[in-house]
Amino acid sequence: MAHRLVEELVREGVIKSESVRRAMLAVPREEFVMPEYRMMAYEDRPLPLFADATISAPHMVAMMCELVEPKPGMKILEVGAGSGYQAAVCAEAMERRGRVYTVEIVKELAIYAAQNIERLGYWGVVEVYHGDGRSGLERHAPFDAIIVTAAARQIPPALVRQLKEGGTLVIPLVEHMGQILYKVTKRGERVEKRAVTYVLFVPLRES
């Protein structure tokens, strides 16, 4: 089932790199969804978790991973851990040679994500923190890339500060026509924004 879904995403042009293709095949999505949704794990759709959170659709996970171009040795910050699935995919795309720091504002979700990450052997490559991801994670900055998995009204300044020069921030922003996913590149004191596609994410929560 995973193979069929991944090959469909390759045909659709969502998955472009072999590293993301391998990662999407390697990470068992059924282990990151609630038990009652395991039979739907390889449908290309978001699924409910708890605390009004969802696990993103596979095409969106693959797309965001492609946009940051993960490579061995990178440091990636994720804002919004959810169940830990996106972080695990990024870790696999880096061949487990790098570090993913993921911050979750809902304590119960942070615990759930940490349990999944540890149970599936990603602990040490992925670190889960409970906190307000809008503030980033200063102690581990700067980051090669940052992925935000909830829709913000503006780019949190702390995330730009904690991004390396030339680094990539992928973030959905709420605009008057809806939510748009942006790829943001840091260039000195300014950022370059490129619109990617319309999306629909849960709102970025505040503590």
Curated annotation (Swiss-Prot):
Keywords: Cytoplasm, Methyltransferase, S-adenosyl-L-methionine, Transferase. SUPFAM superfamilies: S-adenosyl-L-methionine-dependent methyltransferases. GO terms for biological process: methylation; protein modification process; protein repair. The keyword Transferase applies. The lineage of its organism: Archaea, Thermoproteota, Thermoprotei, Thermoproteales, Thermoproteaceae. It holds the Pfam family PCMT. It catalyses: [protein]-L-isoaspartate + S-adenosyl-L-methionine = [protein]-L-isoaspartate alpha-methyl ester + S-adenosyl-L-homocysteine. It is found in: Cytoplasm. InterPro entries: PCMT (IPR000682), SAM-dependent_MTases_sf (IPR029063). Catalyzes the methyl esterification of L-isoaspartyl residues in peptides and proteins that result from spontaneous decomposition of normal L-aspartyl and L-asparaginyl residues. It plays a role in the repair and/or degradation of damaged proteins. GO terms for cellular component: cytoplasm. The gene is pcm. This is Protein-L-isoaspartate O-methyltransferase. The keyword Cytoplasm applies. It is an enzyme of class 2 (transferase). Its main location: cytoplasm. Its EC number is 2.1.1.77. The active site is at S56. HAMAP family: PIMT.
